[in-house]
Amino acid sequence: MVEVLRVANCSGFYGDRLDAAKEMIDGGPVDVLTGDYLAELTTTILYNQRQSRNTGYVGTFLKQVKAVAEHCVANNIKIVSNAGGLNPKGMAEEVEKIYEELGITAKVAYIDGDDIVPDLKDLQAGGETFTNIDTGEDLAAADVVTANTYFGAWGIKEALDNGADIVICPRVTDAAVVIGPAAWKFNWARDDYDALAGALAAGHIIECGAQCCGGNYAFFEEVPSYRDVGYPIAEIEADGSFTVTKHPGTGGLVSVGTISAQLLYEISTPAYYNPDVVAHFDTLKIEQVGDDRVRVSGTRGSNPPPTHKVCVNTRGPYKQSTEVLLTGLDIEKKAEIYLDAILHNIGGREQFDDVDVQLIRSDHEDPDTNEVSHAALRITFVASDPSKLGRLLQAKMTELGLANIPGNTGRGGGGYSGNQVLVHWPCFIDSKKVV
């Protein structure tokens, strides 16, 4: 019988189903429980939490750990997660408290060092420009609040090699929480590229949780039930081949279609880059091998790129939005009149960095109900100076309620204060400078 490592995923984002962790360990045999919580947006959420509550990690993960800790330790199920976010040490300390409260002896490990904010000036002086992948801008003029390198799998493998029962990760690649345990189980070397590429494919497929089990699937009518959609398990073999399945009795579907859809998720070219290996997705084979069982084999890998990706977040301008509902005839003309009046009331468009105007035509001709009778005029004001926004701006818009076009009604928006935006800044760093 082929030896496999059963890696289960219980989370695809911060806010995913809380009881999925317990469901995965109670529903059948698994060897490793993983969870991915760190979308790029999540980093900004954790930054704000760290500023206000001194946390910076995914607090709901602690509830999941408490629910599964005894079972996992008793059955030697490892836990690997990136829920450490911006504070993996703090998360590890909280996990240790949970084990102590439960009277459990377990080894808790955490990975650190992804935060390069303290080193940014030295790195830039050494030639790192951190050029924005999307815009080509240089980071030098930006106001940086977070900067985290996407680590690979080898720190996770080392922690497991040293007997860790749970590994708390910071900003690692989504697939690293799967590659690391597989490399540990089968003792892969850094140049076992085909095996690593297979594990990368497995990690990429199960990283989004229930999404590869029928969630967000375009051909949704193929899915037997969307009640209690199951979460995925990757049964990984020594050569990197794997079979994706889910626990019996759960909803959803594991098919060639659902796995192919997830494989193509966030992919630009068939060469999928990771700090540990490049997986060539045009080499692999996908086949249905049973009910809710799909095997992926033959993935070829090559040496990793010379750079690591970095997730930077910078302080952007301030924004404030409002919406007004327009009804009746001549919607475009009404929108034009309303916009002219509001810009006049507040002293002109030129004082803002930008004014974004969208006319959303959700209205129907000769509507049967009020809900389909209106269009929405959405106005977003952008300013580097926060004094340009706030209560006065909102008041000037409110004043038009009885003094402008017929059939208009406000629908709120950004409230009475313009909020500062945190802007995602994707870039690279020379891998030789990653510690």
What are these regions (language model features)?
Residues F13-Y14, A39-L41, A83-M91, R171-V177, ...:
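Gly/Ser/Thr-rich loops at beta-strand to alpha-helix junctions
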Residues E100-I116, I179-F220, P224:
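Catalytic or ion-translocation cores adjacent to nucleophile or general acid/base/metal-coordination motifs
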Residues V2-E3, L38-N54, V73, I116-A142:
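Gly-rich Lys/Arg/Thr-decorated short loops/hinges at beta-loop-alpha junctions or inter-strand turns
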Residues M1-E23:
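N-terminal amphipathic/basic leader segments beginning at the initiator methionine
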Residues L196-R295:
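A conserved active-site cap/scaffold subdomain adjacent to cofactor or substrate pockets
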Residues Q51-G56, N87, E93-L102, A125-F130, ...:
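A glycine- and small-aliphatic-rich helix-loop capping segment at beta-alpha/alpha-beta transitions
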